A protein has these predicted regions:
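Secondary-structure edge/capping motif, primarily at the C-terminal ends of alpha-helices
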Residues: 236-240, 262-266
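Membrane-interface aromatic/basic loop that binds lipid-linked glycans or pyrophosphate carriers
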Residues: 265-274
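Amphipathic alpha-helical repeat scaffolds of TPR domains
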Residues: 249-261
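Short, charged, amphipathic alpha-helical segments
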Residues: 244-250, 272-273
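A structural signal for alpha-helical segments
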Residues: 220, 242-243, 270
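Nucleotide-sugar donor-binding/catalytic module of glycosyltransferases
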Residues: 1-234, 238
């Protein structure tokens, strides 16, 4: 099997506490021909020194320091500077299994496709782990992949736990200034493919943080989820009419998700009555 250069993009912003664990998992990958791109998005903690140290330690690490532009801007910056034939994302407060890249590349080449997906574990603060992985892999049509994503079945909208051929990004970028940027983008990358490989083993470790933007309580920018979901549903229904029911269900789910967060805001009932 060939071993082309694979670029792994990490958007870095004030993650000094978590970065060492993440980088240890990447520097120890069984797939060696890597370009590890650290995009320091204007960090104000010790990330600058850590990133520079990793670049001195391992020639595969490339560091870019830029003014803060947000997660989407950092991801786009990484893609635009990547030299690899394939691109993967890892969030710096998570970590990956040692064969994360090897596994994604293996199933991608096995089915000769442009994108592959693996499963992930969720690690909670109490030490519990939500593990849903199993053995096996398969090749599916784009329509089937989108359907499963819309139903939260094996595939989700996250940028990570996926390997992309770089050509998929020719006309696709993450929306700057928005949260839920993955919802607005991952389906577009899928729609650039002919077919997609799905691996059922968990190779990515997502660390649940209650204070993260997505997991925190309701703020007005959480409404970005509805906008992103509606746009996604509109585009999917236009190209794949057979997925209309799944797309509408996802739109309903997005609204209930935001409503539940709003109801948890202290004083919401009083604000609503006014």
């Amino acid at each position: 099997m060939e071993h082309p250069l694979i670029s792994v993009v990490l958007p870095i912003y004030n993650v000094e506490k978590y970065l060492p664990v993440c980088m240890k998992s990447l520097l120890s990958q069984t797939y060696k021909n890597l370009e590890i791109i650290l995009v320091d998005d204007g960090s104000s903690d010790g990330c600058i020194g850590l990133c520079n140290g990793y670049a001195q330690q391992d020639k595969r690490v490339v560091v870019y320091h830029k003014q803060n532009g947000g997660l989407s801007d950092a991801r786009n910056y990484g893609v635009e500077h990547a030299r690899g034939e394939y691109i993967a994302y890892v969030d710096p407060d998570d970590y990956v299994d040692l064969d994360y890249i090897e596994y994604l590349y293996y199933i991608l080449k096995k089915y000769n496709v442009e994108m592959s997906v693996c499963q992930h574990r969720v690690h909670f603060n109490a030490g519990t782990v939500d593990e849903r992985g199993k053995k096996g892999d398969e090749e599916v049509t784009v329509s089937e992949c989108l359907k499963r994503m819309l139903y939260h079945d094996v595939i989700d909208t996250s940028a990570w736990a996926k390997l992309y051929h770089r050509d998929l990004f020719q006309t696709v970028r993450y929306p700057i200034g928005k949260i839920y940027e993955d919802t607005a983008t991952t389906y577009r990358l899928m729609m650039e493919c002919d077919r997609i490989a799905i691996g059922y083993e968990s190779k990515y470790n997502y660390i649940f943080h209650e204070n993260s933007i997505i997991n925190s309580k309701f703020q007005i920018n959480k409404l970005d989820l509805i906008e992103a979901t509606d746009y996604m549903a509109q585009n999917i229904k236009k190209r794949y009419p057979e997925l209309e029911e799944a797309a509408v269900r996802r739109q309903v789910y997005a609204r209930f998700s935001i409503l539940n967060q709003m109801l948890e805001v202290p004083g919401y009932s009083e604000i609503r009555s006014e």
